[in-house]
């Protein structure tokens, strides 16, 4: 080793030593910083720092252990990065020190000794021989070494095997003799771990033998030495009670087995395996044990030790198997690793002993325990994919092992594992083997684990079941998804299996149990068919006669067509079937494929575009499917084929026993097939099949059967009627009536519906000839006394369908004699109370009545009254509150359908009697309902009226003949029904009413003007406004409603004749007594008209009228009526404004809502708003607003007591400002109003509350008083002013953000006024002169508050004034106000604002202003002094040099003491003032000022990181300003660089980055000033501010760190003193300062 002498630096030695001492600091952040600093120095001076640290440890043996550990860790950190730079001598010292530290204490102290051990391991990478020698020295033969000597040996050899493995024999020669003497568990652990590391190192050495020094070594070179160690460890140490010892021992055993000779392994294998297995049963942490066992097994397989291992395999697998039965916790890496290690053990066994493994797994699969079977399946899945070659001859055995499970396993949990095994087996030929199709069938069955939710019956909601074993729980949806994916994966990614899938998959189309799998099966079939089709494969076509197991083409088609009617079921059932039909069309029938090729893609596109179940139209889709079926039969053009298709479909009826939706569709399709077939016997037999197979208790099946029979009846009506009558007769036992007879339950519903649908599709002439005798007569006795709802619905449906079949447009001359009798029957059905009826009965019954009304002749008036009275009672039906707004709920839809059916019934009556008399009669029925207290009844009745009026116009204009009426008789009475509803609370009611009025008036006009050539008469011009009124009447604005209703009255007066007006008025008067307050607006209109015409004459009655109207308002509940009353009051004010305002202002505060609305209605009038504002401002500014009274809390103090009139005027302004209508007028009076408000802010500041007496309702009780605070009322009005002028988001937001309004309630209210005027003046510079002129008279007001407000406003106006003449007046006003202390302070502050007027004006007034400000710069009042400083700062930024240069140095000297003042504001102001002097530093006073800059620079830099933000900002700005005077281009460039944070107002410099940069600037550009600078900064080490002490420490560190040795000499820096000072800060009380000091010391690595 070479020896290199290090030159010792006392400064660096002191630094490093101090840092080493500080590693014991109590603060963690400080310790962390010290560690980093030591690393920074050590990284650059590793030999020096490590030597000092080594010496420090050696010399200070008594330092506490924690401190020693920190030092050792620092050494290790440096060593890891600089190992190759160390001198040999230092390395030896470190080795010796590390050895000493590691072995000093005989007891094990892990934290301490482990670091020392790690040091040795790290050094060993460079000095392996020396480390090995040192360790062996401390491992004397025959004695136990220190614990960490042994641990270090293991770690050392493991980390660096190439140079160290040849030494293992020597180490083992010392280990083996003492191995048997070890008693302590911790020594057992360390020896076992070391031996394991040795074995692993040998394996690594042999693997890299090409680079090894001794190439003669083999894997078994050390087996003789390791063998006895293995025997001892295994026999003695595995029995210890210490878990860690057992685990590390068994892991070492596994490693050692890798390097034992075959003979040694053979002799020990049985004992080793038995021992490992026993541990597997005992230990909690199994990862080391399983890893060891895997190593042992790999060695056995590698060396082909079958004889020795065979008898152990069963115990091994028996022990391992339970471990693989536990589902691992994948969030726990250890659990996952253990699980994978166990699987790897089975994989190793399979590689060498596959027969035994397969036999074992076969037996385990028979176990009933779910976990056991799942574990076995996991093993099979693992080995199938990894041992394909080894298991080639075992595949039949594996298949036979899982086959029983595939066929009989009930558990979804196991099925999931089986599915995963099948997809694992698929690529390896298992499915092609005999019995492989069973696997495929299992997957299809898995896809079929599905129960469709849409089966026609509502399923009760089941509460979630508690899952006992969540890890064993698999849902059917999870299994389905797995199986779906597997079948898709097999089809699309394994082309070798195509021959297996095709055409075998067709076998799964027909069986009922595979129904839910059809989407995925057809998807696979489509994929294969298209593949074969694209290459013209020979086996594309299928001979269904030879393939006896496959379904026939007609069976496939029948199956597909039925399933097509539920296309949105799982996995896009409809699209999948259509795609498959298109792909296999040529296979099924050659004549249909062309049509399918055209039609099926369109149907697929339809389904792709209609995927939303909420908007899905089932009926439309079923029609499309039926049309496709019809076209398919037509293209096949073969009656025998059609019969075969019908037979196939009938054979499949039982497939849908549990699915009434599909069964319904099947019946309809069978009916269509029978319609297209001419074989009558076939038709008869299939009708019989339908009747015998239908579930009569299910409404869907009944309907499907009935519609199917209806389809059939289109071609075979008599056969169908004969069969129905047969069932009617043969299902009866008694002769008294059909429904009294016994028969299958529910068959009556099916028969009734069948009659109805047969009527629908039968030929009209044929049906009308049969209906009276052969249809109605047999069934009539049985439908008269129905009680149950389902039977009623079926009967109603039948009657409705029969009525539609007999409609005049079908059977024009037929008279249905039993029409009225059936209608009365329907009325009786609907009239019975629940449960014999429900809403559906009412809906269907009403619709059926509408159908019968259409039949000739017209119904009688008596029957009309019966049916209408009953149906209108349905208007009272309400939706429950829970569903009132839920338009998608069944209840809401049901009630809505009921109301619609009633409207249709009335319109049908009107259609058959399109006369004015009928229309009036129908509206007369609805009149009582239109006045109901229930809103929903009013709305429904008004909608019905509107509906009828529209229908009347439609029927009249579309009729072939002219209307019989020439006039609208009683139009006035009819209109009066609607007038109250024009102002109904309900928007829809109002809209319906107005539109009804418009259409009724149009009908009257139309009847008068209609001609045969001009049936639809163009509406009169008078009616046109009603269209816009109809749209506008929905407004909630009361005034608009009044205006619109007034317009309606004008239009009505123009449109109805004179003789109709009395009727109209008579009816309208009833509206005044309407239950709805909103409907009583007529009186208000009359009152308003009277005051408009006669108001001028009512001067004497103004107080009485105003009070009367206000009193009346108290009893008004209608908003519309209230607005009408207010309009009347405004009409009075148009004649007599001031008297009205005076009465309103006399009302007590706070104003009632009626008084407020009165002020606002007056203000809305453009002729009244201006005089109203002028009157209120005059009251506030020029009339007494308060009187002075003693303060209740201090009798010696006088405070203002406000007058109520002033408070009322203030509040009234605010109430007026709430109106958007007054915006323009308020803007016109802007400067007057803003001036009034700031004056009011002054007069109500610190004012006594205003006490308002409130009269008691009890005459004997004393009147109570409420207290109103004037300033709060003023603030409300102030804010409302800005909202009124639409400046809420600009001026108001800005004022609020400054908190200006909050200041108005404090003694500093003048500051709030200044801020408010600042914002106002910025946005409205044109108003400055107006505001000043308006406020100027109040400068000499008797009220001090007026004077303060005026001066405050004046100071701020200077900032925004551009008028030279006005500026002079403003300045003179301030100079004349330096009297009262507060006024003087405000005036002084305002004088400095002259700078806002520009350079010219500033210099014009500079002498006067500077003189005024300078006199108070030393004022004892700090506030006054600070304001003067700030004011001078502003002046100096603008004033000419000649006016300031003579006093420049004097000012600098006067303000420097303020830099360190405790007052934050003074500090900020003084720095700001100093910065403002920069403009004068380049002229005649440049040299003196340059010196002043450098004198103040240390303070500026320290305070740049002051605790107070305002001080920081002042220093930042000052540094930027002074940078141009620092006579350095580098400095100027730096401070003007935007990225450094000094340029922008919102930017902030990174302080530590700045200190680093500035220290470099200082050293380069001002080397002669560095010494002065650091000696000045060092004074801040004693600062009272912690932050400044830290700043100083950082700055000193940067300066010293950046000083080269030459510069240190040039600048005369005394580094010893400075570093001692920095080191001294390591003892500071503040952790922050200690941390900064440590950081700085870390920079001084070159001292």
Curated annotation (Swiss-Prot):
Keywords: Lysosome, Membrane, Repeat. The keyword Manganese does not apply. It is found in: Lysosome membrane. Transmembrane segments: none annotated. It comes from the Eukaryota. It holds the Pfam family HEAT_Maestro_2. Homooligomer. GO terms for cellular component: cytoplasm; lysosome; WASH complex. Gene3D superfamilies: Leucine-rich Repeat Variant. Belongs to the MROH1 family. This is Maestro heat-like repeat-containing protein family member 1. HEAT repeats lie at residues 9-47, 65-103, 224-262, 351-389, 597-635, 968-1006, 1131-1168, 1364-1400, 1403-1441, 1490-1528, 1612-1647. Lysosome fission factor. It comes from Dictyostelium discoideum (Social amoeba). GO terms for biological process: exocytosis.
